[in-house]
């Protein structure tokens, strides 16, 4: 999560980049204006400032569109039904505060005591999705101020879904949060809990999740072939924690060891000098740590402990082919990066060595969170930091860096593009946006990259997320000059792209209130935009842009029928779907055309000719069928 300074509101560029104006105004061929009316947007985040003008009713400024808020931190109020912690507040209480019926009767409702999410994140996210100047300005909001524990996030999802079910309304839930600490194949205890909650209401419920901001952090190591000759890389920090996904067939065939080096570390220059080896563990396998945790004390020449290496392997999760394996190094250093000058004494360098057969994937867990006094880093060039040169060095990279829950199969994963590279303040002075590196419309290079360990493309779709100006609480105490009473802030990240997508989904659910996640995903991915920037990383779909850029007007105005078993008023039957070999079409038609989701014509067949999909790669395709009554379309999924 990245934060910027207060500036004037300039959200209109996100609306322009996502082509939402035509949907909000009902421009032809759209049958009416769609604004998110009667749709609920769930914001599971740091909370929301209920007094902000962005969340009022556009026709009555005394009315608030926030139906309820569950603060999981607050134990002063009434607990919500079905949950044993936190406090719940309601629309009437918010309106009483807004209109002066009560005064300061409620606690601050956009608040995170851990500082992990900062202050204002939830309000900003909610403004993008459902503010009066946001994507769905008439949607209602249910917010959760979450404690960041995985189980609490799942509880928050259930809270929103339960409320929407009781009210009989469709809902889209925004998750601008996540973690790298998982198997990256969509399995695990939390993934299963998440799946069970989402499946409680399959119709009219969609979850959008941010792909994460680790796309240029070099946090992934692995996915290369192993042999009896060791390969190695370097890490340093306090602590160093690597999470591995290792196939169940390889947990006794891959071995690891750790080498320690000590010397002088310059935090400001990020370099080591005078390094000497001070410790080396024995080789150990993940299987050997299933029953008994591995622990090794790395000692300096004087006998003092320099670092403690620990390793543990969990049992295989149901539905996964991988084991969750962790190597953690407690460097025993004296660090506090919150003070000035920063204190980073006793930092050592560690080399992770690996040999065996097959492949593995691993992720360096980041601890450089807002308010944290620690850090962890990978090494892409040993010579740049003063590390020993080795011929078997393998640098970490940026693939496989999408976070959970975005990589869960029950979500739509959202990456970020550049919304603006500069802005004008209230005096008309132009400033470069804080994180701007690339032109408007190009990829936000921090966006987490795919694929997943089980081979799925990530992210799935991209929306504006770098340098977005939107709502912030009036009590926000961040850096920068406050304008408009301090109620707008510039932020960057996939956290900002995700609510743009969630707001777009709210417009879709207003039109199709019983649409399923699969139907929503298919329509959005089949109607993305491809341009000169998406071409930078090859043909779509790919693991940088997914299926392309969000264009909600294209989705609403030209969306493809989502009854794929029949086309054109039940005149043409198409089966099977998904298909692996021959596709059957029954009925009176003249011609079939197969298109990629980017609109490229791939094949043409006349009636009576066999349409074989056996040679097509797995993925989504568009089938257009010419009949005497007209031309109709359907989505076809190829799955071998």
Regions found by a protein language model. Name each.
Residues 606-633, 639:
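Short, surface-exposed loop/turn motifs with a glycine/proline- and acidic-biased composition
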Residues 166-186, 204-213, 217-220, 224, ...:
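C-terminal subdomain of the subtilisin-like protease fold in secreted/lumenal serine endopeptidases
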Residues 126-130, 142-154, 158-171, 230-232, ...:
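Hydrolase catalytic cores
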Residues 48-123, 267-378, 382:
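Active-site core segment of subtilase-fold serine proteases
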Residues 83-142, 151-156, 405, 489-509:
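Active-site alpha-helical elements of protease catalytic centers
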Residues 1-40, 47-62, 421:
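Autoinhibitory propeptides
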Residues 87-116, 313-318, 383, 417-427, ...:
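Catalytic-core environment of secreted peptidases
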Residues 563-587, 595-601, 618-620, 637-640:
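Surface-exposed, proline-anchored Ser/Thr-rich loop/turn motifs
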């Amino acid at each position: 999560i990245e934060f910027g300074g207060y500036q004037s509101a300039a959200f209109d560029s996100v609306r322009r980049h996502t082509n939402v104006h035509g949907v909000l105004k009902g421009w032809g061929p759209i049958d009416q204006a769609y604004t998110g009316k009667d749709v609920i947007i769930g914001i599971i985040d740091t909370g929301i400032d209920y007094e902000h003008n962005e969340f009022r009713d556009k026709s009555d400024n005394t009315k608030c569109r926030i139906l309820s808020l569950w603060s999981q931190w607050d134990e002063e109020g009434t607990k919500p039904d079905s949950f044993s912690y936190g406090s719940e507040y309601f629309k009437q209480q918010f309106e009483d505060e807004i209109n002066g019926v009560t005064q300061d009767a409620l606690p601050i409702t956009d608040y995170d005591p851990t500082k992990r999410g900062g202050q204002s994140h939830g309000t900003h996210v909610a403004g993008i999705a459902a503010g009066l100047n946001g994507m769905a300005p008439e949607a209602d909001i249910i917010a959760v101020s979450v404690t960041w524990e995985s189980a609490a996030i799942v509880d928050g999802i259930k809270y929103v879904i339960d409320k929407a079910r009781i009210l009989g309304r469709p809902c889209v839930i925004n998750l601008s949060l996540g973690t790298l600490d998982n198997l990256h194949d969509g399995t695990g205890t939390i993934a299963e809990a998440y799946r069970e909650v989402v499946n409680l209401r399959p119709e009219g419920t969609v979850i959008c999740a941010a792909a994460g901001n680790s796309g240029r952090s070099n946090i992934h190591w692995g996915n290369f072939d192993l042999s009896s000759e060791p390969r190695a890389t370097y890490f340093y920090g306090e602590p160093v924690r690597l999470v591995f996904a290792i196939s169940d067939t390889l947990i006794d065939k891959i071995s690891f060891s750790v080498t320690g080096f000590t010397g002088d570390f310059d935090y400001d220059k990020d370099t080591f000098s005078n390094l000497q080896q001070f410790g080396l563990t024995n080789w150990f396998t993940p299987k050997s740590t299933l029953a008994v945790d591995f622990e090794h004390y790395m000692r300096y020449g004087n006998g003092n402990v320099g670092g403690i290496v620990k390793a543990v392997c969990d049992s295989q999760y149901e539905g996964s082919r991988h084991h969750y394996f962790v190597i953690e190094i407690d460097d025993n250093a004296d660090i506090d990066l919150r003070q000035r000058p920063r204190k980073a004494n006793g930092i050592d360098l560690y080399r992770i060595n690996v040999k065996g057969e097959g492949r593995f994937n691993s992720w360096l867990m980041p601890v450089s969170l807002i308010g944290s006094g620690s850090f962890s880093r990978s090494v892409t060039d040993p010579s740049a930091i003063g590390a020993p040169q080795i011929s078997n060095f393998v640098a970490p990279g940026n693939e496989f860096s999408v976070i959970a829950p975005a990589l869960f199969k029950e979500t739509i994963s959202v990456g970020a593009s550049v919304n603006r590279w500069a802005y004008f303040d209230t005096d008309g002075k132009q400033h470069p946006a804080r994180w701007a590196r690339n032109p408007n419309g190009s990829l936000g290079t921090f966006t987490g990259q795919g694929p997943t360990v089980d081979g799925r493309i990530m992210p799935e779709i991209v929306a504006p997320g770098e340098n977005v100006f939107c709502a912030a609480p009036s009590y926000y105490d961040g850096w920068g000059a406050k304008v408009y009473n301090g109620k707008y802030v510039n932020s960057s990240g996939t956290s900002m792209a995700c609510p743009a997508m969630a707001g777009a989904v709210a417009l879709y659910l207003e039109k199709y209130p019983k649409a399923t996640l699969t139907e929503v995903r298919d329509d959005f991915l089949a109607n993305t935009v491809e341009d000169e920037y998406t071409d930078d990383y090859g043909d779509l779909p790919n693991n940088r842009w997914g299926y392309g850029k969000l264009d909600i007007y294209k989705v609403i105005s030209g969306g493809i029928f989502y009854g794929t078993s029949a086309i054109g008023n039940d005149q043409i039957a198409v089966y099977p779907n998904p298909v692996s070999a021959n596709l059957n079409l029954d009925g009176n038609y003249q011609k079939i055309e197969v298109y990629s989701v980017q609109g490229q014509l791939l094949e043409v067949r006349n009636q009576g000719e066999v349409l074989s999909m056996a040679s097509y790669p797995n993925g989504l395709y568009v089938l257009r069928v010419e009949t005497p009554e007209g031309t109709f379309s359907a989505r076809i999924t190829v799955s071998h």
